[in-house]
């Protein structure tokens, strides 16, 4: 029970549940989708974006908050950094300890490389751990990578780089087998066949899941495998990369590292550098809550951009349609799309089903925003929202389905007295995914030599909208590809003796010439929740070095 004014609002949903269960809302036409996105999607609000004045993407648009970080003062002063004092020397430097970073480290070590994995929090503190619904792969008789390609490419508004989408879908079946062999406990039938379900925008049931703990289970397995390779993979945690180091040829040759607890600086020299730092939800674009982990602050984009790497679709973000909108304690937390794939429908305050629950994420997010703005949302003290009618799931599939299939969702709400088996829940879009990022090719190369990028920090895989289940797939497919590529490269590259931060000095000159204003410092490293108290800006040691 909600135990307040929302109980009466929930009764309207309950009264129409049987009727709504039988009602199937028509899919929107292409024209209807375009109109809805144009009017209500946050990415279409021009005043929330600004033109980049410096860097490889000069003249292009970016969210105001991201532009500030991309063009901010560097956290270090190059002349104060001693590049002759090397703390770590390695074949492959992996920056980031999520699904992409660990996959890359594992595959590079498989090729015989000595790997240094640095992460500003701990291995596994990543958006991979937060993912719930599942991972896509076309490995059933009625499906194919070609069909998966059509869904993913179309779902991304045909903006994805074809070679990246091709790699994503064709590597998917082998990635599922690899994860299964490593020990990921996928949902299976009694005969061992993997259970698959639909997601928004999928034409076939190809979603493989581990109940609704899919990301956590995959991350657990990758983390264990990483630590099991301690003879080849050295992990340094609570350490952020704050600048890429180059050599005299302009090739990536390592990174400046900073311990986030002490501010201590360390220099890592490497033959190949892989950025796998994840997303940017903790930038809270346009004030949206986020489903992202605490360290998602766009650091990888900042250090890559300053090193000269081009970005792609940096102006495209994904707002997951169903973030928790009540109670306050879980505002913005992800309500997995699996809830809708199991049959729960989106309902407005009048008890009406106003959209198909499995439209693509950008369309459903826009639909929720429309309902709220036009007065058909449910008013509450936390965030005006719409209902997600979860009791429909047990009605469709039988009592006990919720506890069996989405226990994480049940546990998240029951601690606040809301039983999703009996009561609907309130949802509103939450900042969930960075569609764009550093532009890569199919083997994760950027335009900066020896600098690879994988996972959510990259751009081009999903175009300008991502389908459910393709992010977990992305981090493993391209994390592996980056590791495999680095495993080939390191054997042909010599460690450089001429390390340089000249590109940082050049960036400062460009910044001065463009008359960039403000005192922001980047990379951000951790979000700042100072509630108006600027003293909290000093919480990271060595704010400038």
PLM regions: where:
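Glycine-rich active-site loop/strand segments that organize a redox cofactor
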Residues: 137-168
């Amino acid at each position: 029970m909600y135990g307040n004014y929302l109980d009466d609002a929930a009764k309207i949903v309950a009264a129409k549940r049987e009727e709504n269960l039988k009602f199937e809302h028509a899919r929107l036409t292409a024209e209807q989708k375009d109109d809805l996105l144009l009017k209500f999607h946050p990415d279409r609000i021009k005043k929330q974006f600004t033109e980049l004045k410096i860097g490889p993407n000069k003249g292009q648009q970016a969210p105001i908050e991201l532009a500030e970080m991309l063009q901010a003062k560097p956290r270090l002063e190059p002349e104060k950094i001693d590049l002759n004092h090397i703390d770590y020397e390695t074949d492959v430097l992996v920056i980031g300890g999520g699904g992409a970073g660990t996959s890359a480290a594992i595959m590079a070590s498989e090729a015989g490389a000595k790997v240094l994995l640095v992460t500003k929090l701990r291995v596994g503190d990543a958006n991979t751990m937060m993912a719930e619904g599942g991972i896509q792969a076309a490995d059933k008789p009625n499906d194919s990578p070609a069909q998966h390609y059509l869904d993913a490419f179309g779902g991304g508004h045909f903006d994805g780089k074809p070679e990246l989408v091709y790699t994503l879908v064709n590597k998917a079946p082998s990635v599922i087998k690899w994860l299964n062999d490593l020990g990921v406990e996928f949902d299976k039938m009694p005969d061992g066949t993997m259970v698959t379900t639909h997601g928004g925008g999928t034409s076939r049931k190809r979603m493989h899941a581990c109940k609704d703990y899919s990301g956590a289970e995959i991350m657990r397995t990758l983390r264990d495998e990483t630590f099991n390779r301690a003879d080849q993979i050295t992990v340094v945690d609570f350490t952020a990369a704050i600048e890429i180091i180059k050599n005299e040829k302009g090739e990536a040759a390592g990174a400046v590292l900073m311990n986030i607890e002490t501010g201590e600086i360390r220099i890592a020299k490497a033959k190949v550098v892989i950025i796998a730092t994840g997303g940017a939800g903790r930038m809270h674009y346009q004030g949206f809550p986020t489903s992202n982990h605490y360290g998602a602050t766009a650091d990888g984009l900042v250090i890559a951009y300053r090193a000269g790497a081009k970005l792609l679709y940096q102006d495209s973000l994904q707002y997951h349609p169903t973030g928790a909108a009540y109670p306050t304690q879980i505002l913005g937390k992800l309500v997995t799309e699996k809830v809708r794939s199991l049959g729960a429908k989106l309902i407005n305050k009048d008890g009406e089903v106003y959209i198909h629950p499995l439209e693509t994420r950008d369309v459903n997010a826009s639909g929720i925003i429309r309902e709220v703005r036009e007065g058909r949302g449910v008013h509450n003290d936390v965030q005006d929202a719409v209902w997600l009618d979860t009791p429909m799931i047990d009605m469709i599939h039988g009592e006990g389905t919720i506890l069996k299939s989405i226990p994480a969702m049940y546990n998240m709400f029951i601690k606040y007295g809301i039983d999703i088996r009996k009561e609907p829940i309130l949802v509103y879009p939450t900042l969930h995914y960075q569609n764009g990022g550093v532009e890569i090719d199919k083997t994760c190369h950027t335009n900066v030599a020896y600098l690879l990028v994988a996972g959510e920090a990259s751009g081009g895989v999903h175009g300008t909208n991502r389908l459910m289940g393709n992010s977990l797939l992305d981090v493993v497919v391209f994390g592996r590809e980056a590791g495999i590529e680095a495993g080939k490269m390191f054997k042909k590259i010599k460690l450089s003796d001429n390390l340089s931060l000249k590109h940082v000095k050049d960036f400062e000159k460009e910044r001065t010439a463009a008359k960039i204003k403000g005192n922001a410092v980047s990379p951000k490293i951790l979000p700042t929740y100072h509630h108006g108290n600027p003293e909290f800006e000093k919480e990271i040691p060595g704010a400038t070095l």
